[in-house]
Structure formats: structure tokens, C-alpha cells
């Protein structure tokens, strides 16, 4: 039986979700004006997390500092990130997908794969049911998605990127020569900038050129493992299964997928800080501490890699969790591979009253815990954007707050 995989991707998720909320309240639709999510307009700090199509026309790009974006587009409407809203909408669109698909794999806050294999009796026309899913999400939730239809995850994801927004695209095996092969080789997943430059220098300019090239030659150019992977991808070969989500881990997790890859340690550290800040705050709100930290990264090959480590003792202190996350990240990342996703998970939990008291008071930890409590109280009273936590170390403080971004709840 041929597999049938859908990839459902929210169009400019953060901006679309904020726009839908404002449109429901009778305000201007952010999707139709120069607008963006992220940062502080008055302080001109933070980064652009998402942008509208009109903002893109002014040259505004995801990941750039707010100050730079405002110089390009002085009339840019900025909305602060609201991760409770994002989590709510993410759960809602996944719930719609579950009505139609027997197996759903959520791969980030704004995208999922549906394994529709064997549903032909229920849904004889895959394109028709994809339109129903897409239109149901819009009519019930107020935002648009793209749906890619293909025999595997790679082609489904490529298809969902063809033309946006609010579109359904197919990419079956017989369509590969017409739809996939003419695309620039750099648009193929797992082909990063440096790999694309090597291939282009060797006159391999399109995905079709790569597909028809000799595998051994590609491996000499790019390495044995990567060469085999991208050669397979260029020919539409991918056997990765759609994985139903396992039983929920008893922990707290945050993850984020960025439109622009993370390529520097400074960017990664600031995102890790934001993740730890957000997830630790939620853990403290439940009067819990964790004894284990896990850091997850994902490159352009769709594969997650994780490291975890136990702490000397359970903690709820953001600075300690951030320090451990940085250590784990340094063990995971080679410093070269562009990263699309970063995640932090806290588990092996206990109540904050179950921690063994020490005979010797750690004043540094107590100061850090009081700082965390103060930040939590201010945010609880004035909102999550009321106070922005600076870098934990002097080294990362030099980068400043411009890469600061709290990110989506991934578990609790």
C-alpha cells in the first residue's frame, strides 16, 4: 500500500495568531499591513520573530533586530509575543487535524504530519479532504494553513512550501520532475548554505541536477553521509515514519522552530536562556523542582538530537538550568550545522518541599531564587513582557537583549 502523508503548516504562525485575535476584536488585520511580532518599539530592542507579507516588501526579515526593521519600515506595527496565545492556537489546530487523521505527529508549534495511509474508503480524494482540513481550521480558528500531500514526509513538507498562503499542493512521484527538480538546489532540505555553494560551484544548480548526478561524486563533494542523504532527498526518497506522540512526559518543556536558522553560539545561548526562563517559571508556579535537564536540537535533516543530564540536586533556579542547558548544547552542536529547532525539557520532578535541606546555606542560590520569584511576581501582575531577563553571564550580556525571545510551551 502506498503511503499518503500530509504536512500541515500554519502560515506565519505567530503573526497569524495575533492577527486572528485582533481581527475578532474588530481591529486591523495585521496580515494586511506592515507588521511584525517581537521586540519593544520604544526601546528598539528584541528581534523580529515573524512578519507580514507587506512588511517583507520593505525588506524586513525574520531574526533581525527590531531597530534595523524600524529603519527599513518606520510605520511597522509591532506586537509583543504572546506564548499563551500561541500554545492555545497550536493545540486547537492539532485537535482539528486529529479529527481526520489516525496518526498525527506534531513536529513544532505550527506544523504537523498526518499519516493518511489506508483512509481511502473514508476519504477517496486526498486533495478534497486536505481542503476540508484547511478550510475547517480557517472557519473555526481564523487563520490559514498550507497542506502538502505526498507519499512521504520529505515530499509533503516540500509541497507545503510551494506557494503560500492558504494552499493545498501535491508532490507525488510522477510530479517530481516537473515540480521538484527545477527548484534551486539550496531549497532542498538538508542542503545548507555552504553545501549549496559547493554544489553550485560544481555546476549542480537545481535539485534535478543533484538527482541525476553520480552519488559517489556528490559524496566526494559533501561527505559520505550527507551526500547519500541529499541525493536520496533529491530523488524523493524518504522512509521516515510519522510517529504518533508518546505518552506525555511528566515534565515541563519548551521548544521553538525559527524561520531563520540559528548559526551562532550567541543566538543559541539567548534562545536557551529564554527557553529556560519560560519553562522554569511554569515549573515554579506549580511548586516543583527538577533533577534532570534535556536539550534538543534539530538541523535541516528533520532529525532531533538530544542530551540529558542529572543535576547535583533538584532545582528551580533559572540560572542553574541555563548553565546546564549551555553545557548540554555545547556537547550536541558542532558549531557549524545550521539549527532549526532548540528545545529544553525539565523532568524527574519533585515538590519544592521535598528537597533535602543543607546545613550550609547557599547565599548565591538564595539570591538567584529571590530574583526568580521577583520576576515571576512582576510578570504575573503586569504580563510576560513586563520585565526582560538579561543574560546570566557577563559574556552573553555583551550580546544584549536583541536576541531575547520567550518561546512556545512544548509540554506542560
Outline where the language-model segments fall:
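Gly/Gly-Pro- and Ser/Thr-rich, intrinsically disordered tail segments characteristic of DNA damage-repair
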Residues: 1-229, 235, 281, 365-412
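Short, charged/polar surface micro-motifs in flexible loops or helix N-caps
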Residues: 11-13, 41-44, 300-303, 349-352
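Short glycine-enriched, charge-decorated loop/helix-capping segments at active-site entrances
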Residues: 53, 122, 309-312, 360-362
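Short, compositionally biased low-complexity segments
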Residues: 65-72, 102-111, 240-252, 296-300, ...
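Short, hydrophobic beta-strand segments
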Residues: 113-118, 306-309, 356-361
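A glycine-rich phosphate-binding loop feature that marks nucleotide/adenosyl-phosphate handling sites
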Residues: 151-154, 232-235, 289-300, 339-350, ...
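DNA-contacting surface of Y-family translesion DNA polymerases
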Residues: 187, 195-339
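C-terminal hydrophobic structural anchor segments
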Residues: 315-316, 320-380
